[in-house]
Amino acid sequence: MAEKRIVKVGIIGCGGIANGKHMPSLHKLPNVEMVAFCDIVIERAEAAKAKYGTPDAKVYENYKDLLADESIEVVHVCTPNRSHSFITVDALDAGKHVMCEKPMAINSVEAKKMLDAQKRSGKKLTIGYQSRQSMGAQYLKKEAVDGTFGDIYYAKATALRRRAVPTWGVFLNEYEQGGGPLIDIGTHSLDLTLWIMDNYKPKYCVGTTYHKLNKDTNQGNAWGNWDPEKFTVEDSAFGFVVMENGATINLESAWALNMLDVREATTLICGTKAGGDLYDGVRINGIRNNAQYLLKPNLNPQGAAFYEGANAGDPASMEAAQWINAVVNDTDPCVLPEQAFTVTRILEGIYESAKTGKPYYFD
């Protein structure tokens, strides 16, 4: 069992993702204290302190003031995508372990700065890809490790919404976010797929992005109407990735697409021995005794959580528990920064291919 020493955490960015994921998940852990909150809108930091902070927690408008507090061991970066890199670099250089919300950065140059800072500081860095922690994803990963699928040579990473455009914050702002659904939700599906395949060596990719529905006024959006004039990112994006070993990945992402079969943070993998997907729970398919078979394991029986203080059915809580456990026991986090760097490189390649109309080759 992990040592129950207290880990003091600072939160940088107290908006939607911090309130919806990071702070509630950390709050469940008995050995975590959130002692500092920072936001450029000070009222958000104060509200976060009131709900999740210790009685003597501090609030800041400038993240560098938070980083100057030597008692803080861990920092969670929950800001818009463009600021992920420089805040994370500063936090690592200040001697903090860092969990940065996905994506790692808006491009590979900025992500490389984060990798360099992690190596320079010797501190831990992880990226918030909580989809790996779902029971279905964990099951598929174990089957892959056990060799159930054989050589995985094709996969499809899917993050498709019919009409679920995030209308709050800066999601629609190209400059702040670096893109739309591809970098927002496609990044989860791609990370999940690469992780299950255990393949992080892309050779080249081709991609397309579309701005077909973002100017519509007849929207039917799940989260209220968006402003067409401010919707500067793509509404959908698609990519095809060829890996160095010849395996291929089809990546689909959309906030708005005229389709019914919507799925998010899901993957399908095909190997020489069997296939698997997360389309309806977990499904494993193959041939046995000269007949096709379909296995749908029951992952919902009552049982103990994988980590004390976390709900086994909640990937965000599982992610936070695994992360703090890694800090306390000096082990690797589930998501290694080098893995997240590859995700960023592929996303960047798809965007670049979409701009040029040509394949993008990785060095």
Predicted features, each with a name:
Residues 56-63:
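Conserved SAM-binding strand-loop segment of SAM-dependent methyltransferases
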Residues 17, 308-320:
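Active-site loop of classical SDR/Rossmann-like NAD(P)-dependent oxidoreductases
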Residues 18, 61, 100, 125-127, ...:
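Hydrophobic residues in well-ordered beta-strands that form the structural core
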Residues 1-6, 11, 32, 74-76, ...:
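C-terminal helix-rich "cap/oligomerization" subdomain common to oxidoreductases
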Residues 5, 166, 191-285, 317-332:
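Contiguous beta-strand/loop segments that form the cofactor/metal-binding neighborhood of enzyme cores
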Residues 2, 69, 73-81, 85-132, ...:
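Beta-strand-loop-alpha-helix segment that lines the small-molecule cofactor/substrate pocket
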